[in-house]
């Protein structure tokens, strides 16, 4: 066995440090654990899917309820609130488009939010192309109802 010099140790140390730095830059695989959840669905309701928080953790499950009503933005929001439900927000509208394209192809619908630039307008989702834009709140569009199921940890 030959003698080991300080220079050899420093060289190997530098090489090993470079390997560690390269390893740390590699993408890391992660696991997402879906805990058992029982989601009660009323008659005619359909589960659209999960909505996640910015950190990737589960926020809630979106449920599309049966029945709809056409009307102005305010009328649609009153209709859904009167049922104890919500008008879908912009993010939820995109999930509905992905989960139920056949349902969404039936016509444009109001979304929950007023347009931030002009209170006479609100966001809607056009299902011919699936894009979201603003429309005068007085225009009659579809109103669909959703609810948000938040699994509890007991």
Residues of each region from the PLM?
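C-terminal, surface-exposed recognition/capping segments
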Residues: 90-154
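Extracellular adhesion/carbohydrate-recognition regions
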Residues: 3-85, 133-137, 142-145
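Alpha-helix initiation/capping motif
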Residues: 1-5, 72-74, 97-100, 126
